[in-house]
Amino acid sequence: MTRFLLCSFALVLLYPSGIDMYLVGLPRIAQDLGASEAQLHIAFSVYLAGMASAMLFAGRIADRSGRKPVAIVGAAIFVIASLICAQVHTSSHFLIGRFIQGIAAGSCYVVAFAILRDTLDDRRRAKVLSLLNGITCIIPVLAPVLGHLIMLKYPWQSLFYTMTGMGVMVAVLSVFILRETRPTAPPQAALPQHDAGESLLNRFFLSRLLITTLSVTVILTYVNVSPVLMMEEMGFDRGTYSMAMALMAMISMAVSFSTPFVLSLFNPRTLMLTSQVLFLAAGVTLSLATRQAVTLIGLGMICAGFSVGFGVAMSQALGPFTLRAGVASSVLGIAQVCGSSLWIWLAAIIGLSAMNMLIGILIACSIVSLVLLLVVTPPRVAQYDEEAAVES
């Protein structure tokens, strides 16, 4: 079991590392490539576009050919893309490299969740996904610090060489440590009944798809508007902003790491309801805040709410799928990336302020999700398993 957890964690961590590692070198990259920082900021969107593109096919391939081949190819592509980014001389080639990096990260991300679905039952999967969420929260804090330390002695290209090394390590783990987890097909006579149970149009799956998409939209909106909110509206300098973001990351980590223990006392539905109540409370707090301390409390509620509920919701979303776990993971990833990007784009077009953009999605997410959690309950078997897990 340890090998699957290690490989899954490594596969997932390529995604946030690819986003956060290079940001500290962005001014130098822009200078060397003859582009403005504003032009290179599109590299974030290009990276997400690459991830979404990969998710369109990676899950289906993983279900048909296996998890291990997709993991190996994804890690190998990440290595190649990182080398491309390190060697480019124009901004257009840099963006191409970032797109390919996104394809690689998206493939690995999908496979990681499929592996966890294959190897863990509902109860353990919810706990592991909560831990994974906590580990992922460490990357936005550590990656820029590591990048800064690297650039004290080496040029910005070394950031992508570091990512190359990460890709090589993931590839080695995928080749030598990871074992194939794809379930074998059931007897032909059982296929129609099995397929009906694993439909992507299943009411329960669609409800968890919407809940997780809205939750990711909340957290990505928070990340996107935090520089404007804290440095322009609240008057923080870069140092204070970094400290505030580190504090929020610590809240996320603390809640994520404690969630597995809380799951031993409460059922998953209670944690998801708590998550949405925290989102609603955060929206109300931010809309009424007149002091910086109160605003920071509201932002802390966002981090806590996401951390306590997202892993559980993802586990429930993947629960009904055995043979189609890869496809289900792909659909979840695409919806989350595209849904959050769509909201941020629409809010910018409408002209919402940073604060109103955040408050709007908090209120919408909490109300819609609370209704779905109260109306759409898990299948009877899953409910029984949840209750048995809590009692034990």
Swiss-Prot record:
Membrane-spanning ranges: 4-24, 38-58, 69-89, 95-115, 131-151, 158-178, 209-229, 246-266, 270-290, 294-314, 331-351, 357-377
Q: Which GO terms describe its molecular function?
A: transmembrane transporter activity
SUPFAM superfamilies named among the record's database cross-references: MFS general substrate transporter
Q: List the disulfide bonds.
A: none
Please give the PROSITE patterns that the UniProt record associates with this protein: MFS
Alphabetical list of InterPro entries matching this protein: MFS, MFS_dom, MFS_trans_sf, Multidrug-R_MdtL
Heme in keyword set: no
Q: Which top-level group of life is the source organism from? A: Bacteria
Q: Give the way it sits in the membrane.
A: Multi-pass membrane protein
* Keywords on record: Cell inner membrane, Cell membrane, Membrane, Transmembrane, Transmembrane helix, Transport
| Keyword Transcription (UniProt) | no
What is any one of the record's Gene Ontology cellular component terms?
A: plasma membrane
**Subcellular location, in the record's words?**
Cell inner membrane
Per its UniProt record, what PANTHER family does this chain match?
A: MAJOR FACILITATOR SUPERFAMILY MULTIDRUG TRANSPORTER MFSC
Question: What protein family is recorded?
Answer: Belongs to the major facilitator superfamily. DHA1 family. MdtL (TC 2.A.1.2.22) subfamily.
Q: Which NCBIfam families match?
A: PRK10473.1 (NF007782)
What protein name does the entry list?
Multidrug resistance protein MdtL
Question: What gene name is listed for this protein?
Answer: mdtL
